[in-house]
């Protein structure tokens, strides 16, 4: 309980920084779990610290800000004007918009960001999206709608990203696994930009 009070106090003082730290940490935990539970290579058995760092960077510097903004938009802009804002029909609307707009676009964005941070080409990002987008989206739809219905109904706005991030430890484990799965399967070479002297 004390930890929650510290989190709330920090969220009031520095909301963006707090969300960035929390989201990055939980993305990192997801990647650590993925590497320990689902090692992707029988040849390279070492732990990939850079991969975890990429997950933390994505969570902290990219997703935390997008997620925070997205939940504010869902809360403040997405509702039927003729119903009370917290009516069950508005919760259904928010879940539908979240799952039919944000999720289908967020997954390719994730795979693209990770490819770029891995130093790989856009062709690799396209390959990841081609092979992983639909199965990952189907899994997303099996996991997130029920949770988001609860999240939008019960959890206060300022804690929604935290609630998502806690549940997302498992989701991030899965995403990290899916992201690395394409790379192992295809052994796509890393393309670094040419050095200009």
UniProtKB/Swiss-Prot annotation:
Changing residue 172 to K: Loss of function. The chain crosses the membrane at residues 20-40, 55-75, 97-117, 137-157. Signal peptide: none annotated. It is found in: Mitochondrion inner membrane. It is a multi-pass membrane protein. Changing residue 54 to Q: Almost abolishes function. Its main location: mitochondrion. One of its GO terms (cellular component) is mitochondrial inner membrane. Keywords: Membrane, Mitochondrion, Mitochondrion inner membrane, Transmembrane, Transmembrane helix. One of its GO terms (biological process) is ethanol metabolic process. Present with 1870 molecules/cell in log phase SD medium. Belongs to the peroxisomal membrane protein PXMP2/4 family. May be involved in cellular response to stress. Required to maintain mitochondrial DNA (mtDNA) integrity and stability. Required for ethanol metabolism and tolerance during heat shock. PANTHER family: PEROXISOMAL MEMBRANE PROTEIN 2, PXMP2 MPV17 (PTHR11266), PROTEIN MPV17 (PTHR11266:SF17). This is Protein SYM1.
């Amino acid at each position: 309980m004390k930890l929650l009070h510290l989190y709330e106090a920090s969220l009031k003082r520095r909301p963006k920084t707090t969300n960035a730290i929390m989201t990055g940490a939980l993305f990192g935990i997801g990647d650590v779990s993925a590497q320990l539970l689902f090692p992707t290579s029988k040849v390279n058995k070492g732990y990939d610290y850079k991969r975890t760092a990429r997950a933390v960077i994505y969570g902290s510097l990219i997703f935390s800000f997008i997620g925070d903004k997205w939940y504010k938009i869902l809360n403040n802009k997405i509702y039927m004007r003729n119903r009370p804002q917290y009516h069950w029909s508005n919760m259904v609307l928010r879940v539908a918009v979240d799952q039919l707009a944000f999720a289908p676009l967020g997954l390719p964005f994730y795979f693209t960001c990770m490819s770029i941070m891995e130093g790989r080409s856009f062709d690799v990002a396209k390959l990841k999206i081609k092979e992983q987008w639909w199965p990952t989206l189907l899994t997303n739809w099996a996991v997130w709608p029920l949770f988001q219905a609860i999240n939008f109904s019960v959890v206060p706005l300022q804690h929604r990203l935290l609630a998502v991030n806690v549940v997302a430890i498992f989701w991030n484990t899965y995403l990290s696994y899916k992201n690395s799965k394409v790379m192992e399967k295809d052994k796509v070479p890393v393309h670094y930009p040419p050095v200009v002297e």
